[in-house]
UniProtKB/Swiss-Prot annotation:
Pfam families: Defensin_1 (PF00323), Defensin_propep (PF00879). Belongs to the alpha-defensin family. Transmembrane segments: none annotated. Microbicidal activity. Residues 1-19 form the signal peptide. One of its GO terms (cellular component) is extracellular space. Disulfide bonds join C65-C93, C67-C82, C72-C92. Keywords: Antibiotic, Antimicrobial, Defensin, Disulfide bond, Secreted, Signal. InterPro entries: Alpha-defensin, Alpha-defensin_C, Alpha-defensin_N, Beta/alpha-defensin_C. GO terms for biological process: antibacterial humoral response; antimicrobial humoral immune response mediated by antimicrobial peptide; cellular response to lipopolysaccharide; defense response to Gram-negative bacterium; defense response to Gram-positive bacterium; disruption of plasma membrane integrity in another organism; innate immune response in mucosa. The keyword Nucleus does not apply. This is Neutrophil antibiotic peptide NP-4. Residues 20-62 form a propeptide.
Length: 95
């Protein structure tokens, strides 16, 4: 599987290099004062409205969930992850 991923990465880099070479030849007649798309810095921020896992699991009767730093305790099951102060933890739930 790693070999396949490595070969795919090499193929993509090769294709990108060829595309840049061909676009460089085509752009020789273009005014050098115009910025190219690759020269522009773009920042994209995406924010989604999400329901927290605690709200989803807490809606079921008899479910109690806790954010744990390491692993779930006896009788608890890992049900996802949660973030506390920017640190990702394990979401452990008990029925």
């Amino acid at each position: 599987m790693r070999t396949l991923a490595l070969l795919a990465a090499i193929l993509l880099v090769t294709l990108q290099a060829q595309a840049e070479l061909h676009s460089g030849m085509a752009d020789d007649g273009v005014d050098q004062q115009q910025p190219r798309a690759q020269d522009l810095d773009v920042a994209v921020y995406i924010k989604q409205d999400e329901t927290s896992p605690l709200e989803v699991l807490g809606a079921k009767a008899g479910v109690s969930c806790t954010c744990r730093r390491f692993s779930c305790g006896f009788g608890e099951r890992a049900s996802g992850s949660c973030t506390v102060n920017g640190v990702r933890h394990t979401l452990c739930c008990r029925r």
